[in-house]
Amino acid sequence: MQTLTIIRPDDMHLHLRDGDALKAVVPYTARQMGRAVIMPNLKPPVVSVADALAYKARIMAALPEGSAFEPLMTLYLTDNATSELVREAKAAGIVAFKLYPAGATTNSDSGVTDLFKLIPVLEEMAKQGILFLVHGEVTDPEIDIFDREAAFIGRVMKPVLAQVPNLKVVFEHITTAEAARLVLEAGDNVAATVTPQHLLLNRNDLLVGGVRPHHFCLPVLKRETHRQALVAAVTGEKAHKFFLGTDSAPHAKSAKENACGCAGMFSAMTAVELYAEVFEKAGALDKLEAFASKNGARFYGIPENAGTITLVKQSQTVPASVPYGDGELVPMRAGGEIGWTVQY
C-alpha cells in the first residue's frame, strides 16, 4: 500500500471559534497540525494583546490531553490600531495582524474602513517583523462578488506594497488567477495561503443542480480557469510562495442550511488528505510536504515542526455530520470519499 510521510504540517489560516464550538473543533486540527495561525474574528473581535492571550489560554484548555499543538495568535486590525499596539503585540509573541475590510466576511463589522490611513501602523509592522494577513476583497456594493478579489489587487494591494515595500504580506485564501499572478510577480515579502476548496472546487460546485450551502465560502468559489491557475501556482516553479491555510470555518448545519446561510467550509477534519488529493491529481505529490510543512514556517520565520505524519493511500468516507455544541457540523465532502487517510 502506498504511504507518504511528511513533516507535521501547519495550518496558516484557521478559525476555531470559542466556547463549546472551540471545544468541538480544535481536536481535529490538533491531531493533524503542529501549529495553526488563529483568526481573530470572534464576537467581539480579538483586538488587544490581552484579548489574544486570553483566547490562547482558552484554546490550550480545550486541547486533548497530551497534545503538543501550538496556536499562533493574531490581532484583528481596526481603524484604531496604533504603532504602539504593534510593538506590544511583537513583545507578546503575536505573529500577525489580520485585515478584514469592513463587511467583507463573517464578523468583519469592526474591520478597516480606510487602510491608507493606517500606513504608519503598517510601517511599524514592517519594522517589527510582524506579518500582515489580508482578506483581499473590496466591499464596494457596485463591484460584482466574483470580481472583488481582482478589484482589491489594483485598488489596495499594489498601492500598499508600493508605499510599504518591505512589509511581509500574506494574501489569504487566494481564489483567482490575478491573485496568484500578483504573488508570483511580487518580491519574497509577499506570499499566499490557498484553501482545499479553492484547489478542488469551482463555482459550478456551488450553483449547479441546486444551491450547495456547504460549498458557500468567502471569497466565493470562482471559475474553473481560476482553480486551475491556483493548482499551477502551488505546484509550479515559485511554489515556495504558497502554503497551506485551510480557512476551515465551522458553522452549525442550521446556520448553513438557511435562507441567509453563513459563509465558510469546515475542512479541518480531513485537511491534509484533501490537499494530498490535489497534489496527486496534479502529479506533484513530491511537492505536498513543502506546501504543507515548510513554506509557511519559512515565511513566518519559525522552525519546521519536529514530528511527522503519515498518509496512506486508503479510501475513507467522510461523516455526514459531526457534533457541534448543541447542533451538528457538516464537514467538507460530507458523505463522500477521499482517497487518502492520515494514520493516527
UniProtKB/Swiss-Prot annotation:
Q: Which GO terms describe its biological process?
A: 'de novo' pyrimidine nucleobase biosynthetic process; 'de novo' UMP biosynthetic process
Q: Which UniProt keywords apply?
A: Hydrolase, Metal-binding, Pyrimidine biosynthesis, Zinc
Q: Which InterPro entries match?
A: Amidohydro-rel, DHOdimr, Dihydroorotase_CS, Metal_Hydrolase
Establish whether keyword Zinc is in the entry. yes
**One Pfam family of this chain:** Amidohydro_1
Q: Which residues bind substrate?
A: H15, L16, R17, N41, H135, L218, H251, A263
Question: Where, by residue number, is the active site?
Answer: D247
Record-level Gene Ontology MF annotations: dihydroorotase activity; zinc ion binding
Q: Which superkingdom is the protein from?
A: Bacteria
Indicate where the modification N6-carboxylysine is found in the sequence: K98
Q: Which reaction does it catalyse?
A: (S)-dihydroorotate + H2O = N-carbamoyl-L-aspartate + H(+)
Which residues are recorded as binding Zn(2+) 1? H13, H15, K98, D247
Q: Which GO terms describe its cellular component?
A: cytoplasm
UniProt xrefs under CDD domains: DHOase
TM segments? none
User: Pathway of this protein?
Assistant: Pyrimidine metabolism; UMP biosynthesis via de novo pathway; (S)-dihydroorotate from bicarbonate: step 3/3
- Could you give the cofactor binding note from the entry? Binds 2 Zn(2+) ions per subunit.
Annotated residues that bind Zn(2+) 2 are located at: K98, H135, H173
For the protein in the UniProt heading, the enzyme class is: hydrolase
EC assignment: 3.5.2.3
Q: What does this protein do?
A: Catalyzes the reversible cyclization of carbamoyl aspartate to dihydroorotate.
Q: Tell me the protein family, please.
A: Belongs to the metallo-dependent hydrolases superfamily. DHOase family. Class II DHOase subfamily.
List the PANTHER family: DIHYDROOROTASE
Which protein is depicted? Dihydroorotase
Its source organism is Neisseria meningitidis serogroup C (strain 053442)
